[in-house]
Amino acid sequence: MEDKFDLSSARLVVVKIGSTLVLDRETSGIRSSWLESLTEDVSRLLTRGQQVVLVSSGAVAIGSTIVDRLATYSQVSHKQAAAALGQVQLTHAYSESLKRHGLQVAQLLMGRGDLVDPAHRLNTRAVLLRLIDLGAVPLVNENDTTATCGTRVGDNDRLAAWIAEIINADLLILLSNVDGLFMKDPRNNPLTPMLTEVESITREIEAMATQSVDPYSSGGMISKIEAGKIAMNAGCRMIIANGTRSHPLYAIESGGPSTHFIPVARDRV
């Protein structure tokens, strides 16, 4: 039986934006008009009483255009430098776009400890909820500038899922460059069917996931499946949807293609 879901019913929404959505590959700049459409969607949700946290990738991708990227991209120091340079531009772009809707952005850069250490988790929760109460829009990213192997989260899909768990969000939206979860890789199998709902992450579901081939992306569908496990176990619905077109949140609400991960029923606090 198909699960009916109204996005407007979600009180607290975490939206993760992939780097491929933020970066214009032709100009090596930020997709400003697309970002404006996203922040317009965010403003609409806030106006009707919902709360929104943004988790955005893109700092490394943007910064790498400054440090003359791919030849040495895999070297940690170059990636860290790119993150430092790109984060400034990324935050500024969000700030300017949200400001046009009368909204204030608040930047948070996090490491693994902020999400898994009990004391740090409590602090992360308190800060995020306080910013939301103040009417700000939290903009979260991993702190790639200082992260090491032992402190890295690894990808923003799981980071967003942990954020959703920590603040007890009702909905996690992963905006990507694909419509949802397909039974096979649609790049090689264009006619493969897409799942509209996932009620349990089985071995068969895990086998459908592929790793990202994009040099700027950390996870691909594998990390999204892992994010789904975190969200579903926390009682949070997760949606994977294509965010490449304008007004991606409105597109979901209008019935655009997406895959819904149905959460495990549990008491929310």
UniProtKB/Swiss-Prot annotation:
A single GO cellular-component term on record: cytosol
InterPro entries named among the record's database cross-references: AceGlu_kinase-like_sf, Asp/Glu/Uridylate_kinase, G5K_ProB, Glu/AcGlu_kinase, Glu_5kinase, Glu_5kinase/COase_Synthase, Glutamate_5-kinase_CS
Residues holding substrate: S57, D144, N156
Catalysed reactions, semicolon-separated: L-glutamate + ATP = L-glutamyl 5-phosphate + ADP
Known EC number: 2.7.2.11
Top enzyme category: transferase
Cited CDD domains: AAK_G5K_ProB (cd04242)
This protein's UniProt keywords: Amino-acid biosynthesis, ATP-binding, Cytoplasm, Kinase, Nucleotide-binding, Proline biosynthesis, Transferase
Location within or outside the cell: Cytoplasm
GO biological processes: L-proline biosynthetic process
One Pfam family it belongs to: AA_kinase
Molecular-function GO term, any one: ATP binding
Residues bound to ATP: K16, S218, G219, G220, M221, I222, S223, K224
Pathway in which the depicted protein is active: Amino-acid biosynthesis; L-proline biosynthesis; L-glutamate 5-semialdehyde from L-glutamate: step 1/2
Function: Catalyzes the transfer of a phosphate group to glutamate to form L-glutamate 5-phosphate.
Family (UniProt): Belongs to the glutamate 5-kinase family.
Protein name according to UniProt: Glutamate 5-kinase 2
Organism: Rhizobium meliloti (strain 1021)
Highest classification ranks of the organism: Bacteria, Pseudomonadati, Pseudomonadota, Alphaproteobacteria, Hyphomicrobiales
Gene (UniProt): proB2
